[in-house]
Curated annotation (Swiss-Prot):
It catalyses: S-ubiquitinyl-[E2 ubiquitin-conjugating enzyme]-L-cysteine + [acceptor protein]-L-lysine = [E2 ubiquitin-conjugating enzyme]-L-cysteine + N(6)-ubiquitinyl-[acceptor protein]-L-lysine. This is E3 ubiquitin-protein ligase pub1. E3 ubiquitin-protein ligase which accepts ubiquitin from an E2 ubiquitin-conjugating enzyme in the form of a thioester and then directly transfers the ubiquitin to targeted substrates. Regulates ubiquitination of cdc25. It is found in: Membrane; Cytoplasm. Keywords: Cytoplasm, Membrane, Phosphoprotein, Repeat, Transferase, Ubl conjugation pathway. It holds the Pfam family HECT.
Amino acid sequence: MSNSAQSRRIRVTIVAADGLYKRDVFRFPDPFAVLTVDGEQTHTTTAIKKTLNPYWNETFEVNVTDNSTIAIQVFDQKKFKKKGQGFLGVINLRVGDVLDLAIGGDEMLTRDLKKSNENTVVHGKIIINLSTTAQSTLQVPSSAASGARTQRTSITNDPQSSQSSSVSRNPASSRAGSPTRDNAPAASPASSEPRTFSSFEDQYGRLPPGWERRTDNLGRTYYVDHNTRSTTWIRPNLSSVAGAAAAELHSSASSANVTEGVQPSSSNAARRTEASVLTSNATTAGSGELPPGWEQRYTPEGRPYFVDHNTRTTTWVDPRRQQYIRSYGGPNNATIQQQPVSQLGPLPSGWEMRLTNTARVYFVDHNTKTTTWDDPRLPSSLDQNVPQYKRDFRRKLIYFLSQPALHPLPGQCHIKVRRNHIFEDSYAEIMRQSATDLKKRLMIKFDGEDGLDYGGLSREYFFLLSHEMFNPFYCLFEYSSVDNYTLQINPHSGINPEHLNYFKFIGRVIGLAIFHRRFVDAFFVVSFYKMILQKKVTLQDMESMDAEYYRSLVWILDNDITGVLDLTFSVEDNCFGEVVTIDLKPNGRNIEVTEENKREYVDLVTVWRIQKRIEEQFNAFHEGFSELIPQELINVFDERELELLIGGISEIDMEDWKKHTDYRSYSENDQIIKWFWELMDEWSNEKKSRLLQFTTGTSRIPVNGFKDLQGSDGPRKFTIEKAGEPNKLPKAHTCFNRLDLPPYTSKKDLDHKLSIAVEETIGFGQE
């Protein structure tokens, strides 16, 4: 009997979804997932209230064959009985593409959610786990297998139900796209219903793994190979594809890793390659040697797995392999960056995953001797009121610190300095040691003192050193402008002939602080963090560096400059009294800026002011930084999170804050002002820092306290102004350190509205 007619019982765990689309402005969805197998087996998860990142972790057992199609749809329970059913996305999987039922195994998959036939907007990913059970294989008659696929997807009207059901449904309303398209045997000859082929098959049969059939605008059929990201007019066959895949595995294993990351929506190219060469027990190997402490072994069936002797754990995932995930942000949760990380990564040190007697996954933290249903690598679902930024940063930080590259090496790294010469001594000590030595346990000793470093000395060391090395006196860094206190690289640091060596040293110091989980007492302009993350700088980044110059560039874009400005594609740089003209493009000083090319001029001058003129210094800094912190790991964070990772959250003096706060249309004795300060006393230090970041643009407090807060036009105290309607959220004006606070009628309403504004706001919309 053919393998496609053999049925086996597997476990499908719907773990979580991440970054779902928010269709309502003021309300979050209540997501639940519906699992359907070949249109006849249906299971439903419970609904998770008010979240875009639901965590279900529910397991269902289903009978499948290699040709079975698993459809998982996500809906909003609030809208399930309305038109559209609150559809949030769907994925379709062919079992044989991701799991070999004959061998068995366990696969954790992350898939992009897809649109339905109605083409509604969909965002986000879903994480599922497929695993075989020890039960014996069931034989399913061919006729039954064929007939089962003529049924349509069934969904119960009660989303809370977890019972299997099979109810006929109109195909036109199916939200799974075509869950019944599949690789089933052809319909009975007696049936006159025409056969509809999916994009992965045609009249000659199913395409090889990783291939897709498409039609151009002239109706011609062509084929897409997602494994190699190429197209052809010639229909592929299994033998030629298997041979090419095997050759590629031997010649360029790393290219499979890149393909796997670039096409996450194409059912994972590397897994398809694995399926095509399964008969030879080949696997998609990572490039290079295994990390220290890792070993590759094989199961009795010949499947490779990997042993981490550092943490005494095993995994199916090759530690040399990376996959790409997207970061979401900005308007409409749009994709803003792709970052290479593992799908979930290993569990943090001291954690263990176990199963209950009902096969539900739970996690044991041996560090605190506690258990939880929540995967520590995912956002916490214990409290759905936890703000999104906190769940994301917590998840990223746990992943970041759990990576082998961030684990201290055996041994100790001794650094001895004099307090009065901490900059010079640190430069000599840190630059004489190799990057490997700096990854050992850090032991700081101050000359003439008997203290032992169990954390306190190294924290004080980084605090004192950061005050010295970022001092503008050394000409390495400067304040972003005369009206701010954040730092930027001094473009004229070349007055110090050793400046590039010092920038490499500073890169090592910041990398050292992150590696050993310490903070430096300095905050930089946003563009500096973006350059570390290798993100593109924009005109908006100019505002934190030079607000006046930023407004001038915005004026150029917003107004007709014909006959008004006499500009060329060049800039003048004043270097210690000497004015130098620099071309922004070849022969730029002779090219006039017009209404037609002014956008190009603004883009070029922005890149020059922020990036080009400090390129040499930053490259030296980045060389030292990357010796300790791998680029692919630091890219997990965004620029705001990186600011907290490097600088931490400073203590806030409430009395100093109150003393140096101004009021407009309010007075200190107004009830809402009293409520505001009561809330500040009640809020955590992290939340208060978030409010400062929301209002002033940074969570950093000046060294001399709130009295030194600066705005875009000079000294500006923290200001609370009466503005807006009571049903609106507060607004922030970061250039003027001003919070527009509507006259709310209760302390509870003030707390709620202010919390939403501070915690749920993503990106800049401030004036």
